[in-house]
Amino acid sequence: PDTTGYCLPEQYGAKIKYLMEHVDGVHKAILSTHCHNDLGMATANTLSGVINGARQVEVTINGIGERAGNTSLEEVVMALRCHKHLGIDTGINSKGLTSVSRLVSSLMNMPVQANKAIVGRNAFAHSSGIHQDGVLKDRGNYEIIDPKDVGLDESVIALTARSGRAALHHRLDLLGIKLEQHE
């Protein structure tokens, strides 16, 4: 475990790799990761552990845990899904991640940060004009995950002071207002 959240991903992975290469009979055991997020590296360390031989991860919904928290289930699930080349399938139905996150948040009375990866309110919200235009042209320009894959209906194009014409036209279209080219 990285109980203090101190390790860098390279260090954590090296520890797992060392055990895999130097402990007799280690393949009869299941090495597990248990990382804390004191330096914001719990997910990266967990993934490094998995890449180097750990076959079990100890994670929590929303990263809830001691001090700065533990590795976030939703981050690990979606990171492994995005990096299919690793050949690791969790078997988890990711479409329930957002609803489970919100349920845990409500029951624990622990709000989820708006900018929390995967399940935060702003995880699929775009407020900058260039990002909005890019997402409206092709979601893949600025989103590596389809919101539907985590149980959301769609991305949010928020009208802000940083929005551009594309976002305004998009909003007007949603409202059924059609502008002529010169407007």
Give residue spans per PLM region.
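Hydrophobic faces of well-ordered beta-strands that scaffold small-molecule active sites
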Residues: 1, 29-35, 57-59, 76
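Active-site-proximal loop/turn and secondary-structure-junction residues that shape catalytic pockets
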Residues: 2-7, 35-41, 61-65
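Active-site-adjacent beta->alpha loops and helix N-cap segments on the catalytic face
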Residues: 4-20, 67-75
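Aromatic/hydrophobic pocket-lining residues that form the small-molecule binding cavity
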Residues: 12, 42, 97
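Alpha-helix-loop-beta-strand connector modules within alpha/beta enzyme cores
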Residues: 13-33, 78-83
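Catalytic cores of alpha/beta
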Residues: 39-54
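Glycine-rich phosphate-binding active-site loops on the catalytic face of alpha/beta enzymes
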Residues: 52-69
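A mid-to-C-terminal "edge-of-domain" accessory segment
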Residues: 78, 85-183
